[in-house]
C-alpha cells in the first residue's frame, strides 16, 4: 500500500491511518499479503500495521548534501527521521524493505557508506529483507532510459551492494528503467528481484513496463 504522507499533527492523520488499516484488512480478506509504505509512522502506528502487514518499507534514499538539498522542503525525508524509522522497525521485528535513490549528485563513498550503514543495521537487528537500488529519472511525460554510462554505473553499484550487504538481503532494481536486453547483466551483478511489474509504474509513470515477446 503506497500512500501520500499526512503530517503527524494533521487533523486528517487519524482517518488516514484508519484507512490504511482498513485496506490492509481488505487485502487479507482477498487472500493478498499487504506491504505498506506510508512514510514515517509512530511506534503505535507501525506496531498496529505490522499486525496486518507481513512486511513494510521506507526508502533510506542516501547520505550526504545532495539528498539534503533534494529534500529541503520535505521534513519527513530527513536522514535522521528515516534512520529512526528503520531502527524502530528493527526493534519491533518488522520485516522491512528499504533502498537507495541513485544519481542525484551523491559520491561513490557516500553510496558505500549508506550500504555499510544498512549492513550494520542488519547485523544488529536482522529485519532488513531487501534493498532497492532505484536510479533517479527525470519526470514529465517523456521517458529517458538509462544511458550506457548510467547502466555501467548502476551495475557497479549493484556489485558493491552485493559485496557490502549480508547475503540474506535481496537486491531489487526496477526493470522498466533498463533496456530489456541489459537486464541479464543486472542479474549477473547481483539483482535477484525485479520488483512489482504493474501496468503503470507509480514511481516512474512515463517509463513503460517491459513486454518481452
Labelled PLM ranges:
Residues 1-121:
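Conserved Radical SAM active-site core
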Residues 112-213:
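Auxiliary Fe-S-binding modules of radical SAM enzymes
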Amino acid at each position: 500500500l503506497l500512500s501520500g504522507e499526512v503530517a503527524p499533527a494533521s487533523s486528517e492523520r487519524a482517518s488516514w491511518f484508519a484507512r490504511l488499516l482498513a485496506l490492509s484488512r481488505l487485502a487479507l480478506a482477498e487472500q493478498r499479503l499487504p506491504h505498506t509504505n506510508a512514510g514515517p509512522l509512530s511506534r503505535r502506528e507501525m506496531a498496529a500495521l505490522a499486525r496486518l502487514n507481513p512486511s513494510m518499507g521506507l526508502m533510506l534514499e542516501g547520505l550526504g548534501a545532495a539528498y539534503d538539498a533534494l529534500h529541503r522542503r520535505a521534513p519527513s525525508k530527513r536522514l535522521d527521521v528515516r534512520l529512526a524509522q528503520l531502527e524502530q522497525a528493527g526493534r519491533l521485528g518488522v520485516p522491512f524493505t528499504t533502498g537507495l535513490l541513485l544519481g542525484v549528485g551523491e559520491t561513490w563513498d557516500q553510496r558505500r557508506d549508506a550500504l555499510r550503514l544498512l549492513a550494520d543495521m542488519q547485523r544488529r537487528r536482522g529485519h532488513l529483507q531487501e534493498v532497492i537500488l532505484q536510479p533517479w529519472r527525470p519526470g514529465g511525460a517523456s521517458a529517458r532510459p538509462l544511458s550506457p554510462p548510467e547502466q555501467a554505473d548502476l551495475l557497479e553499484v549493484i556489485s558493491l551492494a552485493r559485496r557490502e550487504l549480508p547475503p540474506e538481503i535481496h537486491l531489487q532494481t526496477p526493470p522498466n528503467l533498463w533496456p530489456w536486453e541489459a537486464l541479464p547483466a543486472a542479474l549477473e551483478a547481483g539483482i535477484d528481484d525485479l520488483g512489482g511489474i504493474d501496468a503503470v509504474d507509480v514511481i516512474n509513470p512515463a517509463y513503460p513496463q517491459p513486454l518481452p515477446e
